Amino acid sequence: MTETHALGSNWAGTYMYQAQKLHRPTKIEQVQEIVANTTSVHVLGSRHSFNSIADSVELISLEDLPAAVVVDHEAQTVSLSAGVKYGDLIKTLNHEGVALHNLASLPHISVAGAIATATHGSGVTSGNLATAVAKLEMVQSSGEIFAISRGEPDFDGMVVGLGALGVVTRITLDVQPAYQVEQRVFRGLRWKALSDHFDEITSCGYSVSIFTRWGEMDNQVWIKSRTDETDWAEGDLFGAVAATVDLNPIIERDAIACTPQLGRPGLWSDRLPHFRMDSIPSSGQEIQSEYLIARRYALEAMEAVRALADEIQPILQMSEIRRVAADRLWMSMNYEQDSVAIHFTWKREPEAVQKMVVQIENALTPFKARPHWGKVFHTDVATIAALYTRHADFVRLVGRLDPRGAFRNLWLRTYVLGS
């Protein structure tokens, strides 16, 4: 089925898609035919990006392809259609008694979209969601299908593909035996304590998030600990006090949408995200941006942002600071560097946010900040090229796999590939 009416906006209502057609294939052969006969095309995922990365003249939704989720216990993998969302994948994984190594803050996003943009959760030893990929199947611009597995040449360049290499139709991910997680929240962490004990705090659980508005006493620390590992003991956390009720990262909001806290153990999938699958995580009245910085620059980078606090706070809903382990994926924000992610959830005030993002990027320039591909940023293509040592290799890979430029939308030309 093909839709030709207005395609609407992203999840937050901050970007209106410009595509003229939306194709909804129900089988792979239709995907091949659409791609081979279209001049300019891209895949539309769960609409959780905050920029035009997933826009083009024509779009393809893979939601109507059979999910075909298959767990291979011997290989410790799960394979699935690229149209599957994490929330739906989780149901099968839990039924089969297996788990992923990590999840993003909300499970409502598509697996393929998260992988293509190197979306991440948190954890000193946990790579982003793309690091779980063991195999990809993809439709090239010629309409042909090819598959590539971990260890083969150029695999590391194809996983975080930004939609530039082809239409990923099937994904195989690493899994492990299911595990339980308990979550505790601490309030009132002071900046000096965070600065003095940053590594201790960010490694005191399997997954740790620090929520802040860049003031002195409004900081929350969310610690998600595997029950089969030893993490932070009872008591305070370098002066921060354990919460006695469930909290929302935005303290004024009800915690009903959030995953259970107070140390109550539960399945990995019910604790690693901040928001429950059966909830609406936000009103959508927001804009997001995020920058990933090598751990060695983290404290200086946070101080540079704090220096802008008076200008940031009027338009900020909340910031989140997380850790992500290094990987070998060419266009991952964590390529060859253990990273600290500084995330901003802004009020939906586009003009003010755009100006603030420029100021933040200027402040973070000395620290070689890499912007999150799916969020709002202004970093130009020349700067991007300098930030990624395999950038030239990626550009060559795009030219080889998509010689006619079918997947090179305006966003890719502007920020990644150049004109």
Where are these regions (language model features)?
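Noncatalytic alpha-helical scaffold of FAD-dependent oxidoreductases
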Residues: M1-S419
